[in-house]
Amino acid sequence: MANHVSFYVNFHEINDAAKARWKEMTQNLVKENYEYWFGDLWVDGKEGSPTKDEVRKYDWTTDHIGPKWCYIQDFDEDSFGGYSAWSAPEDGLVKILEELEKFDPNIITSITYDDEMPNFVGWYVYSGSEMEDGCEDDDEEIREAVFDQNPHLREHWDDANDEWQCDEDGDMTEEAYAAEDEYRDCMYEVINEMQATGIDDCIKFIKEAREEQPAQD
């Protein structure tokens, strides 16, 4: 069974025309079991558009969305979130942005994601439909980030065996159990901070670059 990857997309800079187009696209979504099939965004009944059956085929989803399946769970005028198989729907997001930038070439968008373990987490920022910057961290890098902010937890980690410390019988020590619980409690706070910092810095860079090179009429 595929690992679920949760994702969340924010349109940080988006004009009214692009918002209106996004609203049109989301009107194609049909709720099924409290969620929406990602590919239905493009099922609008117009000539040349895919059908409901087509966007559910493996070849279409992997070519246009990325993951073999992907669901949207919630959306509004400037964000949406959901989950997918094995990876985030980066291709699907670019496909959305290629449409929205027709109405707002200065649209700025971010996506954050993590798999359910998490084995990896990441973020990307897009200027228009072009990826400006991003980062993906694996479980070891996540652990190092947590330990850097909570050095007392590192004392109970066994680097040689890549696990929490155990006693002579191979059982986790009481101190290691407590450290693991604390680690789990603060892990997503550290992850969210890493992602937010990266996104904020990238958006600041994009805006400063645009101020230095204003758009030409």
Name these PLM-found stretches.
Residues 47-217:
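Charged interaction segments
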